[in-house]
Structures are given as structure tokens and as C-alpha cells.
């Protein structure tokens, strides 16, 4: 794995972990699992928290939300934040863009909604699923291609990595 890709992966994990501790309300924090698949040249990363979920947290500020799937789609848009009077809302949008540049996959499951982005192949696919057994927290799965030299840099010039 290149140093640049390793840095992008660390940044993505840091953003997800920051979201857990800043927004989830989980008393237990989160669980993180990762595995490298050498033959397929991919890394799979999963972060799960048992907090209030995206729909509950975002509904506090965005009262027009109707369901968990809408909350997921809103959460990955740049500038969407629950903080009042503060800039933010770049974490999940940057992660989604990194996965797009990497031609990887990302899924977010929260409440009764699940969204899956598949950037591999010729077409980008966003798939919606409704879960029969709702999950109160949030689960984020990333599949990263380690054979690519793709590096995603933050677009906002005010963002600092170091």
C-alpha cells in the first residue's frame, strides 16, 4: 500500500471515529474491525456504534427527514452538520469521495435504512435497502483497493490534516 493511500485510509478512519464520539451518543463508543485480503488486493473496514443513529441525530436539525435512507443520503453531502453556528459536515462526504476515487465500495446502515455505493466497474451504483430489523446505531463498511495509487485530498483549503 502506498504512503498516500495509507494516509487517506487513516484520515477516513479518523473521520468516522470522530463522528462516533461527537454525534452518536453511544456510551460504549464503537467497534472497529478490519481485514486485508492480499489476493484480492483490498482492505475491508467496518465501524459500528450503538448510538442513536443518523436519522435520530439529523432529524433534530433537519425536521423534513422522513426515513433512515434519506438521513444516510443527507449525511454524505458536504456541509451537512448538526452543530449550530459551527462549520463542519465534511467527514462522510470526504470519505465517500475517497472511496469513489479509489473505485471502492461503501455502505452505511442505520435504523431501517441501508445505502450501498459501488464505484467499481463502469457505472457507479447506489443501492437502497430497507432493513426488516432496524439497528439503532450506525454501521459503516468500507472496501478499499490497495493496488491503486489513488489519494484523496481534502478539497476545503481551510481543512488541515496535521
Give names to the regions the model predicted.
Residues 27, 56-57, 99:
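Short, function-defining helix-loop hinge/capping sites that tune catalysis or transport
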Amino acid at each position: 500500500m502506498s504512503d498516500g493511500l495509507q494516509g487517506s485510509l487513516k484520515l477516513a478512519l479518523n473521520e468516522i471515529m470522530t463522528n462516533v464520539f461527537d454525534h452518536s451518543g453511544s456510551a460504549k463508543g464503537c467497534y472497529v474491525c478490519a481485514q486485508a485480503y492480499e489476493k484480492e488486493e483490498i482492505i475491508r473496514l467496518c465501524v459500528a456504534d450503538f448510538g442513536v443513529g443518523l436519522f435520530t441525530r439529523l432529524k433534530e436539525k433537519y425536521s423534513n427527514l422522513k426515513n433512515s435512507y434519506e438521513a444516510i443520503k443527507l449525511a454524505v453531502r458536504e456541509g451537512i452538520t448538526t452543530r449550530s453556528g459551527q462549520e463542519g459536515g465534511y467527514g462522510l462526504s470526504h470519505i465517500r469521495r475517497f472511496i469513489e476515487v479509489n473505485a471502492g465500495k461503501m455502505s452505511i446502515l442505520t435504523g431501517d435504512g441501508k445505502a450501498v455505493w459501488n464505484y467499481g466497474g463502469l457505472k457507479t451504483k447506489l443501492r437502497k435497502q430497507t432493513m426488516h430489523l432496524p439497528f439503532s446505531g450506525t454501521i459503516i463498511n468500507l472496501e478499499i483497493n490497495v493496488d491503486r495509487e489513488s489519494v484523496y485530498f481534502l478539497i476545503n483549503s481551510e481543512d488541515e490534516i496535521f
